[in-house]
């Protein structure tokens, strides 16, 4: 189900003109849709960044404008937090029609130095700065995390991901 929904959303993004290295913002409450978005964006060859919906609107606006985001993927109850953004198309994740697209794996080729995701620093020395991470960097991080993920399978150690904010990598 996860893969089919991610594939369908990725085809929607591709048909909407998303290309490798485009940046798409994800603003969701912690949910299954957050994971669908991350995977779909990567499958479309684009890069994602998560914005915590509890952030103040000015901070969110700064992130979205600074990153030159083309799309914001969000949920119905959060649309008021992104309605002020010019040149930004919202895709409401609560509408099931977005999962009616082709659910096969898209045929997109990415390069090792293409963007995969973006995070922002805390801004402790001024304005937060965007840090762009590449496909090869993501692959290396996942490879390095495999032993940790194996360890976390034991008992209730697997809950670590549920206590971090989604913008945290």
PLM regions: where:
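Short loop->beta-strand "edge-of-pocket" segments that line small-molecule binding or catalytic clefts
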Residues: 160
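Catalytic "switch" loops of ABC-type ATPases
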Residues: 163
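Carrier-protein-dependent adenylate-forming modules in NRPS/ANL systems
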Residues: 1-139, 149-153
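Glycine-rich phosphate-binding loops of NTPases
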Residues: 157
């Amino acid at each position: 189900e996860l893969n089919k929904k991610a594939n369908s959303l990725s085809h929607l993004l591709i048909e909407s003109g998303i290309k490798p290295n485009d940046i798409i913002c994800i603003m969701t409450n912690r949910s299954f849709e957050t994971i669908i978005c991350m995977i779909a964006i990567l499958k479309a060859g684009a890069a994602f960044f998560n914005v915590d919906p509890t952030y103040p609107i000015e901070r969110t606006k700064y992130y979205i404008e600074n990153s030159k985001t083309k799309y914001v993927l969000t949920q119905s109850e959060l649309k008021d937090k992104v309605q002020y953004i010019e040149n930004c198309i919202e895709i409401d994740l609560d509408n099931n029609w977005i999962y009616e697209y082709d659910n096969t794996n898209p045929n997109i080729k990415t390069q090792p130095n293409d963007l995969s995701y973006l995070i922002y620093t805390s801004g402790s020395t001024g304005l937060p700065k965007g840090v762009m991470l590449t496909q090869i960097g993501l692959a290396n991080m996942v490879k390095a995390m495999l032993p940790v993920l194996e360890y976390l399978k034991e008992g209730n150690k697997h809950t670590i991901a549920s206590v971090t904010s989604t913008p945290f990598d």
